[in-house]
């Protein structure tokens, strides 16, 4: 599935095995405690909704979504540092929301570092709300950092 954006030179498509080196490189450049190449490979093998944003013929961002039992979980979303603040993270998030709705998902969850104020602002803009806190969830230079748990309801309860 490809999604084209008329206002920017980018497409979103399903992640392929050949994309893993570029995805891993973006992850390493973006996080102090990155996912390994093997974790991304395992996400593909497990059949998670894994997608890449292509700009100028190169992977410029990626997102991974797990869907099961009427729920979805955003596992990872990241944009290459030089392409941030251009709306690509929002486009990846919109694609995940579209795919979740297409799978009849009721609720979509994610965890985010409270220190990641840019991501928190985007999630709130898209209708996510904080519902819980996971203590010491993330590795951090100063030990551990909590995670804010967010949810967005996609289908009203009947």
Please tell me what each predicted stretch does.
Residues 70-75, 106, 126, 146:
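A generic structural signal for short beta-strands and their flanking turns/coil linkers
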Residues 109-111, 124, 129-149:
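Conserved catalytic-core motifs of GNAT/GCN5-like acyltransferases
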Residues 79, 113-114:
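Short amphipathic helical patch at the helix-1/turn junction of helix-turn-helix
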Residues 93, 116-119, 136-141:
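Short glycine/proline-centered loop/turn elements that form peptide/ligand docking sites
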Residues 1, 107-113, 146-158:
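Conserved catalytic core of the tyrosine transesterase superfamily
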Residues 2-7, 11-86, 90-99, 103, ...:
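Acetyl-CoA-dependent GNAT
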Residues 99, 122-126, 152:
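Alpha-helical structural signal in soluble globular domains
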């Amino acid at each position: 599935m490809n999604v084209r954006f008329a206002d920017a030179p980018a497409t979103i498509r399903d992640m392929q095995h050949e994309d893993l080196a570029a995805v891993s490189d973006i992850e390493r450049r973006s996080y102090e405690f990155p996912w390994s190449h093997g974790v991304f490979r395992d996400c593909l093998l497990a059949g998670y909704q894994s997608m890449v944003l292509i700009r100028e013929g190169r992977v410029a961002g990626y997102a991974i979504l797990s869907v099961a039992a009427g729920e979805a979980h955003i596992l990872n979303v990241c944009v290459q540092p030089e392409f941030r603040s251009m709306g690509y993270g929002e486009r990846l998030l919109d694609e995940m929301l579209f795919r979740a709705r297409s799978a009849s998902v009721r609720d979509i969850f994610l965890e985010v570092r409270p220190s990641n104020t840019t991501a928190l602002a985007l999630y709130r803009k898209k209708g996510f709300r904080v519902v819980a806190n996971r203590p010491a969830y993330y590795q951090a230079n100063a030990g551990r950092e909590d995670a804010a748990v967010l949810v967005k309801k996609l289908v009203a309860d009947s």
